[in-house]
From Swiss-Prot:
<dbReference type="InterPro" id="IPR002514">
    <property type="entry name" value="Transposase_8"/>
</dbReference>
<dbReference type="InterPro" id="IPR010921">
    <property type="entry name" value="Trp_repressor/repl_initiator"/>
</dbReference>
<dbReference type="GO" id="GO:0004803">
    <property type="term" value="F:transposase activity"/>
</dbReference>
<dbReference type="Pfam" id="PF01527">
    <property type="entry name" value="HTH_Tnp_1"/>
</dbReference>
<dbReference type="GO" id="GO:0006313">
    <property type="term" value="P:DNA transposition"/>
</dbReference>
<dbReference type="GO" id="GO:0043565">
    <property type="term" value="F:sequence-specific DNA binding"/>
</dbReference>
<comment type="similarity">
    <text>Belongs to the transposase 8 family.</text>
</comment>
<keyword id="KW-0614">Plasmid</keyword>
<protein>
    <recommendedName>
        <fullName>Uncharacterized protein y4jB</fullName>
    </recommendedName>
</protein>
Length: 152
């Protein structure tokens, strides 16, 4: 008799514990196929996500695409940088160079640099300080500042 009571009690506890939990049943009728997005659909999603103050999650939901996939497409299109939400960096470009025909011309350039007064640049960003002494071209100083700002 105890055995029947224990069984009935166990069954009642099981039903009470799981009551109301299983309301949705999904029937899989065949193999799941990946969705292939056309270039036009991708372009439309990318255009909407490039708008200022665009809600990427809402755009992804509206088109039925995963937000991570949309961000992957945005990164590939250059809309965002390697870190989520970071603006894309400028595309690499060639730097013009000048080839000296004469060795003396090269030595004259080096002598001109050495004759100039030594400069000092202090760069203070985000609580850190960097001091650069000597002659620094404005382009190099600009590149250093932009690189330091990009790490924030």
């Amino acid at each position: 008799m105890d055995e029947r009571n224990d069984s009935a009690r166990s069954e009642a506890m099981f039903e009470a514990r799981h009551e109301g939990r299983y309301r949705r049943v999904e029937v899989i009728t065949g193999p799941v196929r990946r969705r292939n997005w056309t270039d036009e659909e991708k372009a439309l999603m990318l255009a909407e996500s490039a708008e200022p103050d665009a809600n990427i999650s809402a755009i992804a939901r509206r088109f039925g695409v995963n937000r991570g996939l949309l961000n992957t497409w945005r990164r590939a299109a250059g809309q965002i940088g390697p870190v989520l939400g970071e603006p894309a960096l400028e595309q690499p470009a060639f730097v013009p160079i000048r080839i000296a025909d004469d060795q003396n011309e090269h030595q004259a350039d080096e002598a001109g640099i050495a004759e100039g007064a030594a400069g000092r640049i202090e760069i203070e960003l985000g609580g850190g300080r960097m001091i650069v002494t000597g002659n620094v071209s404005p382009d190099l100083a600009h590149a250093v500042v932009m690189a330091l700002r990009g790490r924030r």
